[in-house]
Amino acid sequence: HRTILNVRRNRTERELNAVLVRLLEKEGTHGLAPGIQAPRATFNAIFLIRHAAVHFQKEGIVLRHLCDWACFLTRHWDEIDHALFRTAMEDYRMDRFADLMTAAAVEYLGAEVPGPECEAGMLGRFMEEVLTLSPMPDKPLPRLLRKLSGPYRNRWRLREVLRTPVWRYYYDTVRGQWNEKFTVFR
């Protein structure tokens, strides 16, 4: 990858990519094993939430995404720069999503970290979707239809959680597909 995020998609991706690059330059990496370097915890926290948020707005997320977050929090909570993480989440309208992911990790998966305040109804709706999401179809046409209709059918994800207008999602999708030679068909 030339960039960390898909910077052709929209301004948010470009700006958040710049935040992640600055974070890498500031904090550096740490060695996992001889010859293997990995970004530090704050970088990974921002990246994991952004990755899950992109899936959440398109087709939804599954338990695996939530388990990844719960395991990450359990292991790296003390290493995260929480002020920087919170600022990034608020600046890019992912704070509600991060709170839902963290609250679900604490309440449903037993992550032993401080749980944020979340509206119970929204957390219940979030978990219902996570636990009942059907697999993505294998055939190209049903796959395309699901990708295109999912955000409209589940507008609450965009409006209430990510605070993004539905039209903006579709605009960014068309623009991103134009720049990426229509990967939506894959």
Task: Mark where each language-model region is.
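Conserved NTP-donor binding/palm subdomain of two-metal-ion nucleotidyltransferases/polymerases, i.e.
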Residues: H1-R186
